[in-house]
Amino acid sequence: MRPILALDQGTSSSRAILFDDAGAVLAVAQTPFAQAYPADGWVEHDAEEIWQTTLAVAREALAKGGVAAQDLLAVGITNQRETTVLWDRSTGQPVAPAIVWQDRRTAERCEALRAEGLEPQVTAETGLCLDPYFSGTKLAWLLDQDPALRARAEAGALAFGTIDSWLIYRLTGGAVHATDATNASRTLLWNIHDGVWSPGLCEALAIPVAVLPEVRDSAGFFGEVVPAHLGAAVPIFGVAGDQQAALFGQACLAPGDGKSTFGTGCFAMSHCGTEARLSQHRLLTTVAVQLGGVRQYALEGSIFVAGAAVQWLRDRLGVIGSAGETAEVLARTQGDAKGVYLVPAFAGLGAPHWDPDARGLVTGMTLATGRDELVTATVASVAFQMRDLLDAMSEDGARPERLRIDGGMVVNDAFCQLLADTLELPVERPQLAELTAAGAAALAALGAGHYPGPEQVRAQWRLDRAFEPQRSADQVGAALAGWRRAVALARSP
């Protein structure tokens, strides 16, 4: 047996998971790192701290698993997407704080570019919308703020990358400046049809091509970890953004396969095969994976507030003492909030509405409304938002035949059943919780030649429990009608 080390670099912590060659977890290490909010709407990370915590958890996982680096088959990497790092090629040191995917500082720039008529080109080439969420305007902002940085970038002295590129550069001792197609597809700069950095979009944002990484297959070779870091040279063979890694880890490999990750927010993806299907309903078209030079695509929708709504009940309202109490409440109410609807538009609404001006509300309350109804309405809001995404996917011709789920919320059986009922779709929960890291490990195993093909991932996927829809169409229809009225109110000026 030769284990695989998956590095899972997230928004709030760096993690390392050691897998055996059959996909079972041998050891886990995790450490948080600091979040910085220097101005309203700004979110930054220290890229050097991200590197140091990643290296520390990699060493810790190996120690916990009793595995020496020379015995590893490969390293795989998965990462928070869109977060932007700019560093000096010669020293390997960041020249500015990393601008996190949540950062909104470039909202005005995006509006200006939209007014100039750039968005149709952005969508046509990248499958994305013109939004501060993506890397392109973040990188442009860094270069625009400092003429000296721009001059160094144009001279080829600086390197840009998303977190995967940054870690690869440091792990390989500066030998490799590369990313994979899934991460490149989130930059606002990469043409997902032709598989090249877009000259037109780079010009529109004044991005020097010299700073951009090489784009490789998701199961490609990304160099070797230098011996000084882990004790021996180890090949890096699998790289993917976190949501795409979870899609792969869930064995969603073909059209009709879909997954949704329920954490603080929610990310849903539906596999579209080799067709880059552009959404007519404000979903994102993104690269699901690139293998052997062939790109596979997915439609993606994101919900800003999922588990965060439950945290709000606990931390701000004090309605519950722990997230686990929601299961007890749902067991009592059977998912029926008695006509109460909560729209958790605390930061606007995500896909398919993309309405930054929407605001949270609760509607339908009476004197009979109590704690249980409020808690049920809050949890149900996650299922309703997912139904909005599913309907948009369906109208775009990408409705999944079933939905595989992961993330912190899915340990709650009552939520999973409510989700299946609301979606009118079978919902499957896997045995393995570490789906994102498992996807990176599977890509590494594939790249290293240990897996004969992607189908090995499907063969190793194990079901924990399936949830079948149990409500009648009339019940679901009535509930959805109430939800849509509530959303319309939340979006009213």
How should these model regions be labeled?
Residues 1-96, 124, 214, 230-235, ...:
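N-terminal glycine/serine-rich phosphate-binding loop of ATP-dependent small-molecule kinases
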Residues 5-7, 107, 113-177, 188-199, ...:
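Active-site core segments that coordinate phosphate-bearing ligands/cofactors
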Residues 33, 79, 102, 219, ...:
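Residues that line or immediately flank small-molecule/substrate-binding pockets and catalytic motifs
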Residues 46, 103, 242:
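Short, conserved phosphate/pyrophosphate- and ester-handling motifs at nucleotide-, phospho-/glycolipid
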Residues 63-101, 126-135, 168-191, 216, ...:
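Short beta-strand-loop/turn "lid" adjacent to the catalytic site in phosphate-handling enzymes
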Residues 205-220:
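A conserved helix-loop-beta module that forms one wall/lid of the active-site cleft
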